[in-house]
């Protein structure tokens, strides 16, 4: 089977790249409120130690903590609400019987879409505009697009041959609509997508009251939609690289208003907020 590793989430060749200047002897530490997460490396790989406010300490291999496998799938859905999704270059089918999109690459996408009635309805409407029909081939377990040629003939277009924008929209909407009480992590959901369809994803994010989202983006369309419709629930963090370190700065309420006023030019003026 496919190797389950941290490389599915972070673009690195070896684990040492996670650490500042490659120094694996110094743990990575992330603190929030009264909790702390530490990342270390041993002979078996990357380990994460979680320290809670009630002094409980748990150490788990990275694969158990963040990756859904057939061995830990039951625990994953109840214990760990954090789910990172990365649109894959190639979809690999997984016949795991769960009702949410499997992180990180949505290997059960086809099955999940068939369970989401609202998503199926929306896809039907989108393809109807082009005289096409959304269908699900139960034999191959794949989403397909059908064109009726007349005289009882049809032409089937496989999922992987439809527009990249539509594939990505289906992937992210399936992730949003199939999850509840979860923290969803998306990396540039706008990539390779036509702006009107980006808005369909951001609208789902805004309307999803049961999930929290962490999103990296370089899209003024994504930022503008969120600022316009969800500012009270929004925190924007800007990143910079100074003196060999990654710096993260949270925008203030007044800066959020300035960002909205910049509109499409926001990403040409980020230095204004990083001073």
Task: Describe the role of every protein-language-model region.
Residues 2-181, 248-275:
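Phosphate-coordinating catalytic segments in nucleotide- and nucleic-acid-processing enzymes
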Residues 183-185:
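Walker B motif beta-strand of ABC-family P-loop ATPases
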